[in-house]
Swiss-Prot record:
Reaction catalysed by this enzyme: malonyl-[ACP] + acetyl-CoA + H(+) = 3-oxobutanoyl-[ACP] + CO2 + CoA
Gene Ontology molecular functions: 3-oxoacyl-[acyl-carrier-protein] synthase activity; beta-ketoacyl-acyl-carrier-protein synthase III activity
Keyword Transferase annotated: yes
Pathway it works in: Lipid metabolism; fatty acid biosynthesis
Active-site annotation: 113, 256, 286
One GO cellular component term: cytoplasm
Enzyme Commission numbers on file: 2.3.1.180
Record's comment describing the protein's domains: The last Arg residue of the ACP-binding site is essential for the weak association between ACP/AcpP and FabH.
Name by which UniProt lists this protein: Beta-ketoacyl-[acyl-carrier-protein] synthase III
Keywords: Acyltransferase, Cytoplasm, Fatty acid biosynthesis, Fatty acid metabolism, Lipid biosynthesis, Lipid metabolism, Multifunctional enzyme, Transferase
Cellular localization per UniProt: Cytoplasm
Originating species: Solibacter usitatus (strain Ellin6076)
InterPro entries per the UniProt record, alphabetical: ACP_syn_III_C, ACP_syn_III_N, FabH, Thiolase-like
Length: 331
């Protein structure tokens, strides 16, 4: 069976930066309040003319450039997002056309903040099945389009950004790098605690839904915090145990960047040293499907992630969706 490895990485964030001081002018909040509760200092915001596909295209091109391959070599595109350009056609189709990935197939994957992690796992299994040689997994979200900037509880949390990873087959059997295992679960009983109430078939767009601001993110923060910090710890613990690894074996844990307090709580319960937990939420906020590739890029640039390291990705998102995966880093 072929091995699946991550062979390239590309990211994109819009140039505009929205600071906590900027938010002080919009809602009743301040830098200290935001930093203490979230760990976020600033976030990037897409220009009005920029959509999710535009950021995804930039990230995809960066990944292809890093790998030095043509888009025609891509077999499949998995586009992870909760903010597609349209309900249909899929954003994956728009990206495929723009980058010239002729012959590729693909789809959009909606799993909120766990989306990119689920996409990585799906892509890895396509490769390991022997049916695909190269799968491009992209996480891209323009969360600013579904955020209520009169709600201080949510508007401080989110930013816009995108990242792409190329997964490909490798015959380097003795290299030891690549995908190891994944563990995930969903729990629909928590769906009401983090959601966008309208815009789907349950509550299609109407004057009423717009007037009631139902097309924005609604969150019950305390419920999400308790669940996320507990489940992130549990899924990481169980995945390590299943593969006979100790916490000390992990070179770097790269968690979804939702809230610094959630990450710290999960890491403390897991017993992993803080210096082996990647946190970059201060600069980007929660970019939903973009957080894992953005955090991975920064880890590499800071010299915290090197070839051969055991990497533990973890995420908890709306739904609820939960997951963790282990990889031996390949570059």
């Amino acid at each position: 069976m072929p091995k699946a490895k991550i062979s390239a990485l590309g990211c994109y964030t819009p140039p505009r930066v929205l600071t906590n001081q900027d938010l002080e002018k919009l809602v009743d909040t301040n830098d200290q309040w935001i930093m203490e509760r979230t760990g976020i200092r600033e976030r990037h915001i897409a220009a009005p003319e920029m959509a999710t596909s535009d950021m995804a295209i930039e990230a995809a091109r960066c990944a292809l450039l890093q790998r030095g391959i043509d888009a025609c070599e891509i077999d499949a595109i998995i586009l992870c997002t909760v903010t597609p350009d349209h309900l249909f056609p899929s954003t994956a189709c728009l990206v495929q056309n723009a980058i010239g990935a002729k012959g590729a197939w693909g789809f959009d994957l909606i799993a909120a903040c766990s989306g990119f992690l689920y996409g990585l796992t799906t892509g890895a299994h396509f490769v390991m099945a022997g049916t695909h040689k190269k799968v491009l997994v992209i996480g891209s979200d323009t969360m600013s389009r579904i955020i209520d900037y009169t709600d201080r509880a949510t508007c401080v949390l989110f930013g816009d950004g995108a990242g792409a990873m190329l997964i490909e087959a490798t015959d380097e059997a003795d290299d030891g790098t690549g995908f190891i295992d994944f563990l995930g679960e969903i729990d629909g009983s928590g769906g009401e605690f983090l959601r966008m109430p309208a815009g789907g078939s349950r509550r299609p767009a109407s004057h009423e839904t717009v007037d009631q601001r139902m097309h924005y993110v609604h969150q019950e923060g305390s419920q999400v915090f308790k669940y996320a910090s507990r489940k992130m710890y549990e899924v990481c613990r169980d995945l390590l145990e299943r593969n006979h690894f100790k916490v000390e074996d992990v070179g770097l844990m790269i968690p979804h960047q939702a809230n610094k307090r959630i990450i710290k709580a999960a890491g403390d319960r897991l017993g992993i040293a803080p210096e082996r937990v990647m946190i970059n939420i201060e600069r980007y906020g929660n970019t939903t499907a973009g957080t894992l590739p953005l955090a991975t890029r920064d880890a590499i640039s800071e010299g915290r992630l090197k070839k051969g390291d055991l990497v533990l990705f973890a995420a908890v998102g709306a739904g609820y969706t939960v997951g963790a995966s282990l990889w031996r880093w390949a570059f």
